[in-house]
């Protein structure tokens, strides 16, 4: 009853007074600790912005916040801290997540430690949700120039600078608990996840490297490469309008050898391995997360309850927003999202147009290299254009996703963040992978055949695959995009904040004014750091999700993707640490017990990876045609001679025949006088050039393989998920033990209240309550 009475006194307002100011048991801290600062430009007293500024600050004072004003030459700094009464209310609201036992007095509660992270989190929430009498929020005032910035202060970061945020500590274990104490659980979980992801990339990277190196054994020994290199008598039909000449198949010898570095039988094994790897990675991560949040006392922490408590601290008259669902709003959002996806697909078509036009442009170029290597130049420049498109569309996608979230009107900040994550990732996925989907599954399949080619606007012939297939194009596209994202993005991610910080510091030092007040110097130093926002950590997660997509989706075409990701992540961990500690203002510490919606994103990518890799092996690589030839048309079946290579004659078998007289303008092709036949990659029969029986048989086998591959891979994923429990037994046992001890404690207090009848001795509590005190309590220390 005493706990309920104290909660009533703290929450219920009396008349016009604010309840926090009525708490006499909480005294102001003796030592002033300013952890949060607002910054504004100096205004004259007649400036209307000055009055609006004072109204906002007065509202904060009324809610129990202390404000210290320090004026500099151009700025005014407002140090803000909460009265102890605010933390008293916080303790009471979150004293026991499950509520007190009926008819039982609770033991004296363990005091929730008022850490710097907790103070910052409460102050930040109230500042962001505080409203003046005119209904203006801090964001409204910032837009009108009333305030310039808000940020928590860096304090006590010296140890993190020495032990974590340095390049020489790249291979050291991260001080996760110190990161959590300084930046909060959300940032700490990001680094825990990133560290675990990097660690798990080691076996994937080594396996991918082994598969790639095994291709070198086929560099000279491959029967297919030998036949291509020795095919001096086979003339290939012109691939496009830029190449109006016949080409000997042997001229593509080097290209064919390079293709077989990664288009070999090991690709299938590696694709299945990566499907299993993705599942094991996620399952073991869930176990790792369970151990970490148990250690942090957050196993039963409820984000929604925490946000409601902060809302009540900010405004005792806060009205709960119930869950609502509007089918009309959901339909509008779905339609708008689909329109954006169609735009992404349209961007892929723009890239197709570019590649077609670039082929025509390079073929008439005055540069000999471009004229001779048209296909290579088109592939490389196309990848660069796609990378630039990604940078531009990322900004557009963010704005669209934000507008969709505003229209959807989510209840809470966490719900808004979750929905924004889904919208933004969906748009980013199509932005990054649209060109890869085109190359993998469309390129060379809709271009018709020699003599009757599909043309863009009736003028330009669509590009075709190389004589060795489209796998090389897909490999180059992935290598360039992923390589640029890992190298350029990391360079920009570090250099831009570093240069910006240096420029801000130089401009401040040129003024020649150095404050004497050490507190003002500290606040000014924090002000000169690079600003952060809600998306700072979100952007880091998004970058890693896209990288994870490149590492798993289409990995059959690029087995070196895990190796590139491993090297990139080793740099990324320290790069993010240096940014957060040295170059940026302090992030607002936020609590979390998992990585949220990102886990669903990872699981979705895992499923898409199985489907995409199955289709790449079936439709893009030459694996299925090779297997069908080996067991249906191979000379091994006819001669019964084991010494004969079963792929002998495969190249000739996979090329269709075209009569040069069927060209619309055969005389316009260089060297056509003595050529009656040319070959091209397809399964068609002259004279009508319709698809042959082999084509339909291969198509059936390809579809059957996709279904079989997906079912086998998904079954392996399900078995792995079942075999590896999400929560370790040790965690379950600790949780069970604490539940039992807690019930015994309540039983003892209940018997004491009833007069001591059969009360017995007080049950012993766990000797080491750190990880096992998760239910005692409070789950609020940071």
Swiss-Prot record:
Listed transmembrane segments: 199-219, 265-285, 332-352, 374-394, 424-444, 553-573, 605-625, 704-724
GO CC list: endoplasmic reticulum; plasma membrane
Activity regulation information from UniProt: Cation channel activity is activated via phosphorylation on serine residues by cAMP-dependent protein kinase A (PKA).
Glycosylation site list: 641, 652, 674, 690
Lineage: superkingdom: Eukaryota
Modified residue annotations for Phosphoserine: 250
Residue intervals on the Extracellular side: 220-264, 353-373, 445-552, 626-703
InterPro entries associated with the record: Anoct_dimer (IPR032394), Anoctamin (IPR007632), Anoctamin_TM (IPR049452)
Gene Ontology MF terms in the entry: calcium channel activity; channel activity; chloride channel activity; chloride channel inhibitor activity; intracellularly calcium-gated chloride channel activity; phospholipid scramblase activity; protein dimerization activity
Family, as annotated: Belongs to the anoctamin family.
Pfam families named among the record's database cross-references: Anoct_dimer, Anoctamin
Effect of residue 604 to A: Impaired calcium-permeable ion channel activity
Compartments (UniProt record): Cell membrane; Endoplasmic reticulum
Protein source organism: Homo sapiens
Name by which UniProt lists this protein: Anoctamin-9
Other observations noted: The term 'anoctamin' was coined because these channels are anion selective and have eight (OCT) transmembrane segments. There is some dissatisfaction in the field with the Ano nomenclature because it is not certain that all the members of this family are anion channels or have the 8-transmembrane topology.
Post-translational modification: Phosphorylated on serine residues by cAMP-dependent protein kinase A (PKA) which is essential for activation of its cation channel activity.
Gene Ontology biological process: calcium activated galactosylceramide scrambling; calcium activated phosphatidylcholine scrambling; calcium activated phosphatidylserine scrambling; chloride transmembrane transport; establishment of localization in cell; lipid metabolic process; monoatomic ion transmembrane transport; sensory perception of smell
Tissue spec. comment: Expressed in the kidney. Expressed in the olfactory epithelium.
């Amino acid at each position: 009853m005493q706990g309920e009475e104290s909660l009533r006194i703290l929450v219920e307002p009396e008349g016009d007074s604010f309840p926090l100011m009525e708490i006499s048991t909480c005294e102001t801290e003796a030592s002033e600790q300013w952890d949060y600062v607002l910054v504004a430009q100096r205004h004259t007293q007649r400036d209307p912005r000055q009055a609006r500024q004072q109204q906002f600050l007065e509202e904060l004072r009324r809610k129990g916040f202390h404000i210290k004003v320090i004026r500099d030459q151009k700025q005014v700094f407002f140090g803000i801290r909460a009265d102890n009464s605010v933390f008293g209310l916080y303790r009471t609201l979150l004293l026991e997540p499950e509520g007190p036992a009926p008819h039982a007095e609770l033991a004296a509660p363990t005091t929730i430690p008022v850490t710097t992270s907790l103070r910052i989190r409460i102050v930040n929430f109230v500042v962001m949700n505080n409203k003046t009498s005119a209904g203006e929020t801090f964001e409204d005032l910032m837009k009108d120039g009333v305030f310039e910035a808000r940020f928590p202060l860096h304090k006590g970061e010296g140890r993190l600078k020495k032990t974590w945020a340095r390049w020489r500590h790249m291979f050291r274990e991260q001080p996760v608990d110190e990161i959590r104490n300084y930046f909060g659980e959300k940032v700490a979980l990001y680094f825990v996840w990133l560290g675990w992801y990097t660690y798990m990339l080691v076996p994937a990277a080594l396996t991918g490297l082994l598969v790639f190196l095994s291709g070198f054994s086929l560099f000279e020994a491959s029967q297919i490469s030998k036949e291509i290199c020795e095919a001096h008598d086979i003339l290939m039909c012109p691939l496009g309008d830029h190449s109006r000449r016949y080409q000997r198949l042997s001229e593509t010898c080097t290209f064919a050898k390079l293709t077989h570095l990664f288009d070999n039988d090991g690709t299938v094994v590696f694709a299945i391995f990566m499907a299993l790897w993705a599942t094991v990675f996620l399952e073991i991560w869930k176990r790792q997360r369970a151990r970490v949040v148990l250690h942090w006392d957050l196993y039963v922490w409820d984000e929604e309850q925490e946000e409601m408590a902060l809302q009540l601290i900010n405004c005792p008259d806060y009205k709960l927003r119930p869950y609502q669902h509007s089918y009309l709003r959901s339909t509008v959002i779905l339609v708008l999202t689909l329109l954006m996806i169609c735009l992404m697909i349209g961007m892929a078509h723009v890239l197709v147009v570019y590649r077609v036009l670039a082929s025509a442009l390079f073929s008439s170029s005055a540069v000999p290299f471009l004229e001779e290597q048209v296909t290579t130049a088109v592939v490389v420049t196309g990848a660069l254009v796609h990378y630039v498109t990604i940078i531009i569309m990322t900004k557009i996608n963010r704005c669209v996703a934000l507008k969709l979230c505003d229209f959807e009107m989510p209840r809470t900040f966490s719900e808004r963040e979750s929905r924004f994550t889904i919208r933004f990732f969906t748009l980013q996925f199509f932005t990054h992978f649209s060109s890869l989907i085109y190359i993998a599954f469309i390129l060379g399949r809709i271009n018709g055949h020699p003599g009757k080619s599909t043309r863009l606007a009736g003028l330009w012939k669509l590009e075709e695959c190389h004589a060795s297939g489209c796998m090389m194009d897909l490999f180059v596209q992935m290598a360039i995009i992923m390589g640029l994202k890992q190298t350029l993005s990391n360079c920009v991610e570090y250099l831009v904040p570093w240069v910006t910080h240096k420029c801000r510091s130089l401009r401040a030092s040129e003024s020649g004014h150095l404050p004497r007040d050490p507190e003002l110097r500290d606040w000014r130093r924090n002000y000169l750091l690079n600003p952060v926002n809600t998306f700072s950590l979100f952007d880091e997660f998004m970058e890693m999700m896209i990288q994870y997509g490149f590492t798993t989706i289409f990995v059959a075409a690029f087995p070196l993707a895990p190796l590139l990701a491993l090297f990139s992540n080793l740099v990324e961990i320290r790069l993010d640490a240096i940014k957060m500690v040295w170059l940026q203002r302090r992030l607002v510490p936020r609590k979390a017990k998992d990585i949220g919606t990102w886990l669903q994103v990872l699981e979705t990518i895992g499923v898409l990876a199985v489907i995409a890799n199955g289709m790449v092996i079936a439709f893009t690589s030459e694996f299925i045609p090779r297997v069908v030839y080996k067991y249906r048309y191979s000379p091994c079946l006819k001669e019964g001679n084991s010494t004969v290579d079963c792929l002998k004659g495969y190249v000739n078998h996979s090329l269709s025949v075209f009569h040069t007289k069927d060209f619309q303008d055969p005389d316009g092709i260089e060297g056509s006088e003595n050529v009656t036949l040319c070959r091209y990659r397809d399964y068609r029969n002259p004279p009508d050039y319709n698809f042959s029986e082999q084509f339909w048989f291969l198509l059936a086998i390809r579809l059957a393989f996709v279904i079989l591959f997906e079912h086998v891979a998904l079954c392996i994923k399900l078995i792995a998920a079942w075999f590896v429990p999400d929560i370790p037994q040790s965690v379950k046992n600790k949780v069970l033990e604490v539940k039992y001890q807690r019930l015994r404690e309540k039983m003892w207090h209940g018997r004491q209240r009833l007069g001591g009848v059969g009360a017995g001795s007080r049950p012993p509590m766990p000797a080491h309550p750190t990880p096992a005190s998760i239910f005692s309590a409070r789950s609020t220390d940071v």
